[in-house]
Amino acid sequence: MDPLAQGHEVVILSRSGGDFQWDVSYGYIDPAAFEGVDAIVHLAGAGIAEERWSAARKRELVNSRVRSTAVLYQALSTIPHSIRAVISASAIGYYGADTGEAECLETSPAGLDFLADCTKQWEAAVDQIASLGLRVAKVRIGLVMGAEGGIFPVISKPIRWGLGANLGSGKQWQSWIHITDLLRIFNELLINPALSGVYNGVAPEPIRAGEMNKQIASALRKPFFLPSIPGFLLRLVLGEMACLVLGGSRVSSVKIEKDAAFSFTFVRFEEALKEILHV
């Protein structure tokens, strides 16, 4: 994330490196990290798709989000500061890994699977910060697309090798967002004091997984003819986390467009694809 381009002076709070250190396991934040700071962008959390979901890994996924937020809450409760707003990442996983054809609004209920429960606990921890009188906003982020960041390098790799195939039916909805628009949403939430609560961080036009794959293959001038990989095989290999590739959701961007008069730079996936691949 590069808010510097938006005119912000940024200090980084990290477990290692960065400008200031914190240690979630010990509940410690360097008090100097808050000096002269008027807003926090909270992005902490272990990667959802980096490891198979063992019981221990699932605990880590939840704890890395909930405990880091609790440490932040405790610090904001006790350390003198001039912070007025906290903008936190969240995820469209709040609605569940697979919501079928239903359109998910910010008011839609949470899903019932692990992904939804993890995100629900995360958001509940973030909401505690609002009790301190600070403005709090959460961004339920979809599939982030960028040349080097987000999910695009992962999903495009097998296609680049000529080994692209749909995972499951290919009919799953993919609610995506170009990284540039995601940064613009975070920036809008930082600078606009009228915005609080939860916002979906997705582009206006979701796309079916199969169509997304075909567009990537076409842009890369690669064949896309291999048969779909069946769901049972993916569940056998990936276990519970197969829901990440077999499920999908159709998430609405209307609220951020209406509340912030926000206009997306990349509305359709093919527009984002052209920018990412420079075609």
Which functions belong to the PLM regions below?
Residues G17-V71:
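NAD(P)H-binding glycine-rich loop region in Rossmannoid oxidoreductase-like domains
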Residues N63, T99-K138:
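Catalytic helix-loop patch of NAD(P)-dependent Rossmann-fold dehydrogenases
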Residues A70-D113:
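Conserved Rossmann-fold NAD(P)-dependent oxidoreductase catalytic core, especially the SDR/UDP-sugar
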Residues D127-K138, G142-W173, I179, I216:
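NAD(P)-dependent short-chain dehydrogenase/reductase
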Residues S156-G164, Q172-I207:
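Alpha-helical substrate-binding/gating segment
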Residues L189-E240, L277-V279:
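Mid/C-terminal beta-alpha module of Rossmann-like enzyme folds, strongest
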Residues A209-K214, R235-S263:
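Conserved C-terminal active-site "lid" loop/helix of NAD(P)H-dependent oxidoreductases
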Residues V267-V279:
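Amphipathic terminal alpha-helices
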